[in-house]
């Protein structure tokens, strides 16, 4: 009985080491393909890029940066969809917050900047000219 138990124990240890090694290799391959450019051309074209923090960008690229039209979906569910310049929102775009608020308008380097409308989840809104993220003139 002791011989059988030892044989079973050694067999299980071998299987665990073998399959554990295989599983480890499979997981490493998955990790490599689940972040970075996962589809298309993320250098100079149209591609999908998954960031390690869970964010994902789908859109146009120029010189390895988001540039042109694109959408980023953040890990928390918020999205920005619109124009990009050198990896920052720049130009016309829409940002949807996880609480239901939304900003539609002009952007400059991740800030509301220019003509835009901030729409609250209750339907109220602030329309006007924004500068560096702040409403400076209502209209």
Model-derived features: where do they sit?
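Glycine/tyrosine- and acidic-biased, solvent-exposed loop/turn segments at the edges of beta-strands
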Residues: 3, 16-139
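Bacterial N-terminal signal peptides
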Residues: 7-16
């Amino acid at each position: 009985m002791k011989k059988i138990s030892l044989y079973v124990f050694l067999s299980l240890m071998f299987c665990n080491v073998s399959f554990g090694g295989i599983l480890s290799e499979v997981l490493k391959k998955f990790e490599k393909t689940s972040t970075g450019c996962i589809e298309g051309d993320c250098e100079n074209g149209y591609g999908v890029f998954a960031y390690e923090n869970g964010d994902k960008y789908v859109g146009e690229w120029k010189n390895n940066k988001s540039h042109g039209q694109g959408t980023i979906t953040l890990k928390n569910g918020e999205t920005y969809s619109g124009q990009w310049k050198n990896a920052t929102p720049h130009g016309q775009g829409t940002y949807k917050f996880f609480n239901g608020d939304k900003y539609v308008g002009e952007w400059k380097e991740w800030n509301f900047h220019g003509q835009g409308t901030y729409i609250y989840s209750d339907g109220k809104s602030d329309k006007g000219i924004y500068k560096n993220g702040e409403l400076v003139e209502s209209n």
